[in-house]
Amino acid sequence: MMKLALFSIIVILFSLIGSIHGADVPGNYPLDSSGNKYPCTVLGDNQSCIDVCKKHGVKYGYCYSFKCWCEFLEDKNVSI
């Protein structure tokens, strides 16, 4: 019985690790006309980052590490 409980706990832990790692969404930092990343001050949902990402052709972005990050932004659309 103890082995079954231990096995169950291990399976659950590996499942959680897999779901956390699998949540990564591809994207990129957009660049302005000078080749600089767009700065932001409010981390997380940020309307200015969403606006920047829309200029680069994607629907959503947010402030990450004080720079705008755009989800699903491809390399070819990074620079304006």
From Swiss-Prot:
Sample GO molecular function, one term: sodium channel inhibitor activity
Cysteine-cysteine disulfides: C40-C63, C49-C68, C53-C70
CDD domains: neurotoxins_LC_scorpion
InterPro entries: LCN-type_CS_alpha_beta_dom, Scorpion_toxin-like_sf, Scorpion_toxinL/defensin
UniProt keyword annotations, A-Z: Disulfide bond, Ion channel impairing toxin, Neurotoxin, Secreted, Signal, Toxin
PROSITE patterns reported in the protein's UniProt record: LCN_CSAB
Domain of life assignment: Eukaryota
Cellular-component GO terms for this entry: extracellular region
Signal peptide: 1-22
Location(s), subcellular: Secreted
Keyword field contains Chaperone: no
Residues of the LCN-type CS-alpha/beta domain: 25-80
Tissues showing expression: Expressed by the venom gland.
Function in brief: Probable neurotoxin that inhibits ion channels. Is toxic to mice. Is about 2.8% of the total protein in the venom.
Record remark: domains: Has the structural arrangement of an alpha-helix connected to antiparallel beta-sheets by disulfide bonds (CS-alpha/beta).
Family: Belongs to the long (3 C-C) scorpion toxin superfamily. Sodium/Potassium channel inhibitor family.
Name under which the protein is recorded: Toxin Acra I-2
Source organism of this protein record: Androctonus crassicauda (Arabian fat-tailed scorpion)
